[in-house]
């Protein structure tokens, strides 16, 4: 007999980070969905990497970290990007316990505030790290973006 697939089993697979298995079992890509909300505006300011933030409160999250992802808004084609899932210790302080989902859409400057998006993480790039300062975080974000573009085979 095969594995019995239930919602609890899927949640466990996602929490362990096996998003390929979760997607195959769901019959569709595993995704994080929600309305884009305002964040601290630090990503677009200091980090020069604007993000679309969605609340993580009701979502089943994979392990904290950075992922190469596809982002879908409405009926538009998926846009390549990068997503951070975690509690943003460098920006918000260690142990704040409140997870966020922040997606940077490559080459997209559309105002998404209030619109529903689906974030489809496809490749884990690295775990969540506390950086000594925003500049160190910014340098790592640039490396993460390059890694995500490579993983998603972006042509830019």
Residues covered by each model-derived region:
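Phosphate/ribose-recognition catalytic cores of enzymes acting on nucleotide-derived substrates
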Residues: 1, 39-156
